[in-house]
C-alpha cells in the first residue's frame, strides 16, 4: 500500500530549497505577557529541525 503523508507533520515542517527541514519555534502562541520581550524576539522565525529527527521527519513527509 502507498505511504500517506503525515498531515500533522506536513503542516508544521517546510522543506527549504536546499532540502533542509525548517520548523516554527514553540512558546510563542499565547501567554506572552509573562514572557520577556527578549525571549519573544528570540523565538521569532524558523529553525532547522534537529539532526537526530531529520530522518524520521522526512519519512513522515514521504521524502525519505
Swiss-Prot record:
GO biological process, one term: translation
Location of the region described as Disordered in the Swiss-Prot/TrEMBL record: 1-50
Keywords (A to Z) from UniProt: Ribonucleoprotein, Ribosomal protein
UniProt GO MF annotations: structural constituent of ribosome
A Pfam family the protein falls into: Ribosomal_L35p
Source taxon at top rank: Bacteria
A GO CC term attached to the entry: cytosolic large ribosomal subunit
InterPro entries linked: Ribosomal_bL35 (IPR001706), Ribosomal_bL35-like (IPR021137), Ribosomal_bL35_CS (IPR018265), Ribosomal_bL35_sf (IPR037229)
Ranges of Basic and acidic residues composition bias in the record: 21-36
Compositional bias of kind Basic residues: 1-14
PROSITE patterns: RIBOSOMAL_L35
Family: Belongs to the bacterial ribosomal protein bL35 family.
PANTHER family given in the database record: 54S RIBOSOMAL PROTEIN BL35M, LARGE RIBOSOMAL SUBUNIT PROTEIN BL35M
Name the record gives this protein: Large ribosomal subunit protein bL35
Organism whose genome encodes this protein: Corynebacterium jeikeium (strain K411)
Amino acid at each position: 500500500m502507498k505511504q500517506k503523508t503525515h498531515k500533522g507533520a506536513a503542516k508544521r515542517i517546510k522543506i527549504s530549497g536546499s532540502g533542509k527541514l525548517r520548523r516554527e519555534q514553540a512558546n510563542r502562541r499565547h501567554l506572552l505577557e509573562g514572557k520577556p520581550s527578549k525571549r519573544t524576539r528570540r523565538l521569532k522565525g524558523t529553525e532547522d529541525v534537529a539532526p537526530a529527527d531529520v530522518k524520521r521527519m522526512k519519512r513522515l513527509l514521504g521524502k525519505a
